[in-house]
Design a protein with these regions (language model features):
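Polytopic alpha-helical membrane proteins, predominantly small-molecule transporters/carriers
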Residues: 1-312
Length: 312
């Protein structure tokens, strides 16, 4: 049963992540933020919403200080990865290039898990991961990749991918020696602490007044986004605690597939209802119809990859 549960939670995490990524695209196009550290701060500090659950589920300490420290480090690595991701989004804005490079996480996590955790999968599972990786790359290329941006974008995205992969492997190591709740709670402490550190040490003073005003005026909007983000992380982390982290990251590579369907839905909604905030996303949504034949083949490959990693 746990084999099915980790898959379902990983799938839910990918779906929620797709919604959050589309909202991130909207925020970039609407120029809500002025500096890439600003969405990093919001993403980090508002994860403190999890602490509201403490009166109901209680506080639980990991099995040792070493495990607790590893969980916190994993959270810090997570928020650091998001900073480099947002830096690329704000500096270049070409989501096809960014998505293509982010898909390297599918390859990075199995390597890191093999080296650091000794995680071993069978041949069919590795082949399934390969198909998901190839399919995810094909989805990115179907939208047209500006290869001229690759040298400039790669140096930041490779750092983001490495940090996120290391974060996931750290979390899996924590779950091998602790309960889900204690590991996730201290991982969350690292994320929130990283967000606070981003504000204190990395947000230039000339941006702070505008950031404060933006945060106040859009607080409820941010609250909704980060609640979704928290729900996605909850599902992803629960999947990691139940199944191999390599397979969890592979299933989460289905996020571009969810983006295709969600963006297509938003496109048709925008045609039916003249809502300005929906119409802002129309150009991005329209891009999802480019290279549809290639995308169909890519999604078929990914579906077969999912079948292979679920063969047991």
């Amino acid at each position: 049963m746990s084999e099915q549960l980790w898959f379902l939670f990983a799938l839910a995490g990918a779906g929620i992540g797709a919604v959050v990524q589309i909202i991130d695209m909207y925020l970039r196009q609407d120029e809500v933020f002025s500096h890439p550290i600003e969405p990093t701060i919001v993403s980090g500090t508002m994860q403190a919403m999890l602490w509201l659950s403490l009166p109901f589920v209680g506080f639980e300490y990991p099995s040792s200080g070493l495990v607790a420290g590893l969980a916190v480090i994993g959270g810090v690595l997570h928020i650091a990865s998001l900073f480099f991701y947002f830096k690329v989004v704000f500096s270049f804005g070409d989501m096809s290039v960014i998505s293509m490079l982010w898909n390297l996480l599918v390859a990075a996590v199995p390597i890191l898990a093999f080296v650091l955790l000794g995680e071993r999968l069978d041949a069919l599972e590795y082949f399934g991961i390969l198909l998901l990786f190839v399919g995810a790359l094909a989805l990115s290329f179907a939208e047209g990749v500006d290869t001229g941006l690759l040298p400039a974008v790669s140096k930041y995205m490779l750092v983001a991918v490495f940090l996120m992969g290391l974060s996931m492997v750290c979390l899996k190591g924590v779950y091998e020696h602790s309960t889900y709740w204690s590991g996730y709670l201290f991982y969350n402490f690292g994320i929130v602490g990283g967000g606070i550190a981003g504000y204190v040490f990395f947000l230039p003073k000339r941006y702070r007044r505008r950031f404060h005003g933006t945060f106040r005026s859009l607080f409820l909007f941010f609250l909704g986004i980060e609640f979704l983000q928290l729900a996605g992380e909850f599902c992803s982390n629960l999947a990691t605690s139940l199944g191999p982290v390599s397979l969890v990251s592979a299933v989460e590579s289905l996020q571009p597939v969810f983006i295709v369907f969600i963006a297509a839905g938003l496109f048709f909604i925008g045609k039916l209802f003249p809502w300005r905030r929906i119409r802002v996303l129309q150009p991005m949504c329209r891009e999802q119809f480019q290279g549809m034949r290639v995308k169909m083949v890519a999604m078929a490959l990914m579906a077969f990859g999912v079948y292979l990693i679920q063969h047991i």
